[in-house]
Amino acid sequence: MLSPKRTKYRKAHKGRIHGNAKGGTTLNFGTFGLKALEPERITARQIEAARRAITRAMKRAGRVWIRIFPDLPVSTKPAEVRMGSGKGSPEYWVARVHPGRVMFEIDGVAPELAREALALGAAKLPIKTKFIVRSVDA
């Protein structure tokens, strides 16, 4: 699963996801992509599940690029522990995804198969997404 090798700080504030994505809104690598339409925190497990679903649907043909990375630690306290006595320990990693962000890109497969594969991947994610195709520039 994806996680940073090292971080500047062990724990992070919760924060909020305001506005649309500033960068990463266009296809840079592949021909087809999956774009986020809602703001949400996507966990490393969800990214991995989507990646597996996409690769399996493509039958290992073509290439997949993951354009988001879980760099935010989420800490939780154990069950049935009283309030106070500090913040819990980091449990898992999430990526903050803004609307308009391209999350996955694929190439080397037919358009129908690409749409099907990305739809299977989108089913593993907790947000509404959109299938996008690289526009042909004249």
UniProtKB/Swiss-Prot annotation:
This protein's UniProt keywords: Ribonucleoprotein, Ribosomal protein, RNA-binding, rRNA-binding, tRNA-binding
Any one GO molecular-function label of the UniProt entry: tRNA binding
InterPro entries reported in the protein's UniProt record: Ribosomal_uL16, Ribosomal_uL16_bact-type, Ribosomal_uL16_CS, Ribosomal_uL16_dom, Ribosomal_uL16_sf
Basic residues: bias regions: 1-19
Its job: Binds 23S rRNA and is also seen to make contacts with the A and possibly P site tRNAs.
Family membership noted in the UniProt record: Belongs to the universal ribosomal protein uL16 family.
Protein name: Large ribosomal subunit protein uL16
Organism, as annotated: Granulibacter bethesdensis (strain ATCC BAA-1260 / CGDNIH1)
Lineage start: Bacteria, Pseudomonadati, Pseudomonadota, Alphaproteobacteria, Acetobacterales
